[in-house]
A protein has these predicted regions:
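Transmembrane alpha-helix boundary/anchor motif
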Residues: 67-75, 137-138, 167, 171
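Membrane interfacial helix motifs at helix-loop boundaries and amphipathic/re-entrant anchors
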Residues: 49-59, 115-120, 173-176
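Juxtamembrane boundary at the C-terminal end of a transmembrane helix
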Residues: 167-181
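Hydrophobic alpha-helical transmembrane segments and adjacent short intramembrane/lumenal linkers
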Residues: 82-154, 158, 164, 168
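Selected alpha-helical membrane-embedding segments in polytopic membrane proteins
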Residues: 2-91, 95-97
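Short, strongly hydrophobic alpha-helical membrane anchors
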Residues: 1-3, 180-181
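Short secondary-structure boundary micro-motifs
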Residues: 1-2, 8-10, 119, 128-130
Length: 181
């Protein structure tokens, strides 16, 4: 039985996944769910990005990050011959990221306001670090299940995905800057 059958609620499923209680395979392997979670993930990335970059650049970056996540996850799953888990894995990654947006966005706005005022807050920085570490645990949990590996393998997969997203984001920002110049 899937989480969405009966009276289950999708938001509750993603929160439970953030608490490491559910696995990606507990979600339905639904293309509709994947599309919905990818769209919401892209929109939340866009909202985060417009804090620091111009609107067109934020849109391109948000779309690029989503494409990178899809490509990298599909490549990882292909390496372990588990491509059938793609929809659930991607839905889990996108959905849990959206859940983390809820505490992350106000924290990001606070840190941005402090930076613009030339100030720092150890509390804000510590909370941001804790949120990042927790997001790695969530991603590691998702990858551990999707790749049928140990938690440490999930951590390496999570770190690899984050590193690839970072490199791709810088490359896209450079490209957008060159096109806009």
């Amino acid at each position: 039985m899937t989480v969405l059958s009966g009276t289950g609620v999708l938001g509750h499923a993603y929160i439970s996944m953030c608490l490491l209680r559910l696995r990606p395979q507990d979600l339905p392997a639904s293309s509709t769910l994947l599309l919905l979670s990818a769209v919401v993930y892209t929109v939340t990335n866009f909202v985060v990005l417009i804090i620091d970059v111009a609107l067109p650049e934020a849109l391109v970056l948000a779309l690029a990050v989503t494409v990178v996540v899809v490509a990298v996850v599909n490549a990882m799953l292909a390496l372990v011959r588990n491509r059938q888990r793609a929809n659930q894995t991607l839905s889990a990654l996108f959905g849990t990221s959206v859940i983390l947006f809820v505490p992350g966005y106000p924290l990001l706005v606070w840190m941005n306001a402090l930076r613009e005022a030339g100030q720092r807050s150890n509390l804000a920085e510590t909370l941001w670090l804790l949120l990042f570490v927790w997001s790695l645990f969530i991603m590691a949990h998702i990858f551990r299940n999707a790749l049928s590996t140990r938690l440490i393998g999930g951590f390496f997969a999570a770190l690899a995905l984050d590193a690839i997203i970072m490199v791709a984001s810088y490359a896209v920002r450079d490209w957008v800057g060159a096109v806009g110049a």
